[in-house]
A protein has these predicted regions:
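Conserved glycine-rich cofactor-binding loop
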Residues: 13-14
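Conserved glycine-rich Rossmann-like NAD(P)H-binding loop of the short-chain dehydrogenase/reductase
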Residues: 27-44
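Substrate-binding pocket helix/loop in short-chain dehydrogenase/reductase
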Residues: 95-108
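Active-site helix of classical SDR
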Residues: 119, 155
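SDR active-site lid
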Residues: 167-232
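Conserved NAD(P)H cofactor-binding loop of Rossmann-fold oxidoreductase domains
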Residues: 87-92
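Residue(s) in the substrate-gating loop at a strand-loop-helix junction
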Residues: 139
Length: 260
């Protein structure tokens, strides 16, 4: 009988996903690591093995039916799952009408369809066990409407709403659910954004990936609120976003991306 808990992390090959994998290995978890980049996954798995964790790479493109099927099969084959981290995601550049439609479709599949299907597969194991945890990495963007990020904000809002509803359903089953809503975080994702024409957000707005992940895990382990917003600056920003008129929020988000 396995004695170590098992976690599955999507988007594990870089950024917040890699940090989650390392943090969970340090907490005694074995891991299923899901991403498209098999080479990076194998390097990460070897690194985690030095800590005593068993880490299995699952090479899958979650924007495709084949990739989702591979991931669902990995969950079913494991026969147990203690924690799911829905982390895989990406953003597009430019206004909705100017962004390639194929990329927007892929974002919808990754942020919505993949999250739903992988969570469904995980719950088939968690519900009978009456325990488990599900973290979906949403964003503070889920609380705003930002020009140049329309579908990103919309799909992140889906993830947050999905998690809030799921928490109500799963709480009585002993399954904890969290929507992690970080702001700007020092990762490859935001480095690509900050090097682009949109410019760089002020330094005080940036978080470390380690702080984001530790905030998430501490809150989940403590049985805290469903919504996790790391950083005092973002707690204030979300409070304002929930109470200010849409046109004011539009001005705020435009100023954030203004060039220095």
């Amino acid at each position: 009988m396995p004695t170590r808990p098992l976690a599955l992390v999507t988007g594990a090959s870089s950024g917040i996903g890699t940090v989650f994998a390392r943090a969970l290995a340090a907490r005694g978890y074995d891991l299923l690591l899901v991403a498209r980049d098999g080479a990076r996954l194998r390097v990460l798995a070897a690194e985690l093995a030095t800590t005593g964790a068993s880490a299995t790479p699952v090479v899958a493109d979650l924007t495709t039916d084949a990739g989702l099927a591979v991931t669902e099969e990995a969950i079913t084959h494991a026969g147990r799952l203690d924690l799911l981290v829905n982390n895989a995601g990406f953003g597009t550049k430019g206004q909705m009408v100017d962004s390639p439609l194929e990329l927007q479709d892929q974002m919808l599949r990754l942020h919505v369809i993949a999250v739903n299907r992988i969570t469904y597969a995980a719950l088939q194991l968690m519900k009978p066990a009456r325990r488990g945890g599900i973290i979906t990495v949403s964003s503070v963007a889920s609380f705003i409407n930002s020009t140049g990020n329309v579908n990103y904000c919309a799909t992140k809002a889906y993830q947050r709403s999905f998690s809030e509803g799921l928490a109500l359903e799963c709480g009585p089953l002993g399954i904890r659910v969290q929507a992690l809503c970080p702001g700007f975080t020092h990762t490859e994702f935001h480095q690509r954004m900050s090097d682009d024409q949109q410019g760089r957000a002020p330094e005080w707005m940036w978080l470390s990936a380690d702080d984001v992940v530790q905030s998430s895990l501490r809150q989940l382990e403590a049985g805290g609120a469903t919504i996790c917003i790391p950083g005092a600056q973002y707690k204030v920003a979300v409070f304002l976003a929930r109470h200010l008129p849409l046109w004011v929020k539009g001005l705020m988000t435009r100023n954030v991306y203004k060039r220095d």
